[in-house]
């Protein structure tokens, strides 16, 4: 595999004193694998796509949040009306006396989890902050740099308050119905999920929820769950020695032959071929 593209500071920051900036992706197009000379926060507003981070695939949609380190390699593929924002920053340029490491996973090392979910309430809280931050980052004076860093501190603290682990059902009991559904789907990789039962439990209209989900994500509920399972299968095939039948079971497929058919249709190759190619590429 060739050396990935490196995104340079000089192409994204107005001057050497600027610590934070906003890079919109309206919408995000397919983007080849790359690393950076800076770090970034990625927040997805709507649509869907495949985000491959350090060789691990994630099917992303509304509310997905990533903390990307400079040395991380990632790419975007199979995008469908994917709207996201990148808040980019240079750790060495931050001047505020803030405990950045406690607010930004992986700030000092690779141990922090890169992938989180942000609640609908949290998305509403951070959107105006990002808008303000973007406005300040476009100004060419020192006070604007200082204001942008203050807003960045507010942003990362707000994200910490409202984020939750992708499959943690207890973290968003008071949150919007769509958040609950996406969390429930992420927690159903290895077992069946029945939307009708979910709607009975939440006392909501199944038809209305299906429509809301499709409007916000660009996918049906079943398609999204299938994509989550295929992404998990790709990870297991590359990083474990599990047999294909075992991978199928762990990804919610009782029939390994059916799993292979679905995998081939979604990925363009069989599970065995994927395992061989992904390991060779790594």
Swiss-Prot record:
All residue ranges annotated as the HTH araC/xylS-type domain in the record: 179-277
HAMAP family: HTH_type_RhaR
Biological role: Activates expression of the rhaSR operon in response to L-rhamnose.
CDD domains: cupin_RhaR_RhaS-like_N
Transcription regulation recorded as keyword: yes
Species of provenance: Enterobacter sp. (strain 638)
Marked site: Interaction with sigma-70: 246
Taxonomic path: Bacteria, Pseudomonadati, Pseudomonadota, Gammaproteobacteria, Enterobacterales
GO cellular component, one term: cytoplasm
BP-aspect Gene Ontology terms: positive regulation of DNA-templated transcription; rhamnose metabolic process
One GO MF term: DNA-binding transcription factor activity
Transmembrane segments: none
Complex and partners: Binds DNA as a dimer.
Main location as per UniProt: cytoplasm
Name of the protein: HTH-type transcriptional activator RhaR
Chain residues forming the annotated DNA-binding region: 196-217, 244-267
Keyword Cytoplasm: yes
Subcellular locations according to the entry: Cytoplasm
Annotated keywords: Activator, Cytoplasm, DNA-binding, Repeat, Rhamnose metabolism, Transcription, Transcription regulation
Database matches in InterPro entries: AraC-bd (IPR003313), Homeodomain-like_sf (IPR009057), HTH_AraC (IPR018060), HTH_AraC-typ_CS (IPR018062), RhaR_RhaS-like_N (IPR047220), RmlC-like_jellyroll (IPR014710), RmlC_Cupin_sf (IPR011051), Tscrpt_act_RhaR (IPR023699)
Stored SMART domains: HTH_ARAC
